[in-house]
Amino acid sequence: MIDTTWVIILSFLLFAIGTFGLLSRRNLLFILLSLEIMLNGIILLFIAASNLHGNNDGQIMYLLVLTLAASEVAVGLALVVQIYKQQQNLDVDTLTKLRG
């Protein structure tokens, strides 16, 4: 079995990679993917902390964050598709306003 310390280190690495992608990328789709990587790091940390303390609260939080991530992806991808249809571009720097 993998030691809990390594799982916690992996979760922080995932969160750091997601943060780097969020801050360095300008494409809206890559920003959305970076947010998902960050959420996966948080989910992994909840499960590792739950295993470390011997209770199931982290697994319940896993289900809550997973549901939140799924709804975020659905809304985010719908917005990305609409922005691409209107602007033909997903660069955050060039998107100044959204017209209805």
UniProtKB/Swiss-Prot annotation:
**In what way does this protein cross or attach to the membrane?**
Multi-pass membrane protein
Keywords from UniProt, A to Z, are:
Cell inner membrane, Cell membrane, Membrane, NAD, Quinone, Translocase, Transmembrane, Transmembrane helix, Transport, Ubiquinone
- The EC number on file is 7.1.1.-
Q: Which domain of life is it from?
A: Bacteria
Tell me the Gene Ontology biological-process terms attached to this UniProt entry: ATP synthesis coupled electron transport
InterPro entries recorded for this chain?
NADH_UbQ_OxRdtase_chain4L/K, NUOK/Mnh_C1-like
Q: Which Pfam families match?
A: Oxidored_q2
What is catalysed by this protein?
a quinone + NADH + 5 H(+)(in) = a quinol + NAD(+) + 4 H(+)(out)
Cellular component terms (Gene Ontology): NADH dehydrogenase complex; plasma membrane
Mind telling me which residue stretches traverse the membrane in this protein?
4-24, 28-48, 60-80
Q: One MF term in GO for this entry?
A: NADH:ubiquinone reductase (non-electrogenic) activity
Location of this chain's protein in the cell = Cell inner membrane
- Assigned protein family: Belongs to the complex I subunit 4L family.
Q: What does this protein do?
A: NDH-1 shuttles electrons from NADH, via FMN and iron-sulfur (Fe-S) centers, to quinones in the respiratory chain. The immediate electron acceptor for the enzyme in this species is believed to be ubiquinone. Couples the redox reaction to proton translocation (for every two electrons transferred, four hydrogen ions are translocated across the cytoplasmic membrane), and thus conserves the redox energy in a proton gradient.
Outline the subunit composition.
Answer: NDH-1 is composed of 13 different subunits. Subunits NuoA, H, J, K, L, M, N constitute the membrane sector of the complex.
The record's NCBIfam families line, in alphabetical order, gives:
PRK05715.1-1, PRK05715.1-2
The protein here is known as NADH-quinone oxidoreductase subunit K
Organism in which the protein naturally occurs = Shewanella woodyi (strain ATCC 51908 / MS32)
List the lineage, top down: Bacteria, Pseudomonadati, Pseudomonadota, Gammaproteobacteria, Alteromonadales
